[in-house]
């Protein structure tokens, strides 16, 4: 085992991280039990969309179709099919660091397997984070370190930032006048401002700016249609990067993402051309 590889052991009724270097206990007072993490209850953190008009809109059923790696949406089984945000972003290069990662895999099948593993990991971390925001206590004892340590990063960020309110989470957005659709992670109120936060369990890519901007375009358009003011619109964008490489304690990376509507237009145009 690598010296930096962490295993889990139960000791004295509490769960800790251990390694060859000896016992390492992190945040004993912060977590009720190391592998049982809870952020609070629904009332305390406001896990609702208070505005009835938004609730009615968001409760509409969306039809989803998937062809290969592409995902398509339409609202209420009506109208044209539109691509998902991530499908559109498939035409945009993630940059040199992604290209280097791809080059490290021997062939296409290995690259796809690594991608699928990362996607499954990300989906699980997202699901756990959503349960925590709903006020549930989540037991992650049986998950591997790559999941547990990312969840601990989320827990640490939440308690450090202390969002005043959860405006919406895991919402599927579509609009008949916009030629893409998608599901964002959550919008929270931080220091009086509505922040769309996108959870990432991998590296930072410039495409994350475009992705968050696409969600903002959809959300703000819905607010305009419903006659809602700035109180409900998104004021800023952020990426929350949850990694498992830390040793001395959870180290979530919270980064501002750039609002880039012009780049969104270019990406959509390129996707439609291709």
Regions found by a protein language model. Give the residues of each.
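Metal-dependent nuclease catalytic cores that hydrolyze phosphodiester bonds in DNA/RNA
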Residues: 1-181
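Nucleic-acid nuclease catalytic cores
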Residues: 144-149, 171-274
């Amino acid at each position: 085992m690598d010296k930096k590889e962490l295993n889990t052991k139960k000791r004295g009724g509490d769960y800790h991280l251990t390694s060859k270097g000896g016992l390492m206990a992190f945040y004993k007072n912060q977590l009720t039990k190391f592998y049982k993490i809870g952020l609070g209850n629904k009332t305390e953190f406001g896990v609702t969309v208070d505005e009835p008009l938004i609730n009615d809109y968001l409760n509409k059923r969306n039809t989803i179709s998937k062809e290969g790696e592409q995902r398509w949406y339409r609202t209420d089984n009506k109208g044209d099919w539109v691509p998902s945000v991530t499908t559109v972003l498939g035409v945009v290069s993630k940059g040199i660091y992604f290209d280097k990662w791809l080059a490290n895999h021997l062939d296409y099948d290995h690259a796809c397997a690594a991608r699928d593993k990362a996607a499954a990991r990300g989906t699980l971390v997202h699901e756990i984070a959503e349960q925590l925001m709903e006020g549930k206590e989540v037991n992650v004892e049986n998950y591997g370190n790559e999941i547990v340590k990312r969840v601990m990063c989320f827990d640490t960020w939440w308690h450090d930032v202390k969002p005043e309110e959860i405006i919406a989470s895991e919402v599927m957005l579509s609009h008949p006048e916009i030629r893409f659709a998608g599901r964002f992670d959550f919008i929270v109120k931080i220091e009086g401002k509505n922040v769309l936060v996108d959870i990432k369990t991998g590296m930072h890519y410039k495409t994350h700016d475009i992705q968050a901007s696409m969600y903002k375009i959809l959300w703000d358009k819905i607010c305009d249609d419903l006659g809602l003011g700035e109180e409900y619109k998104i004021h800023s964008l952020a990426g929350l990067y949850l990694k498992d490489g830390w040793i001395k304690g959870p180290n979530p990376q919270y980064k501002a993402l750039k609002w880039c509507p012009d780049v969104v237009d270019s990406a959509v145009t390129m996707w439609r051309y291709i």
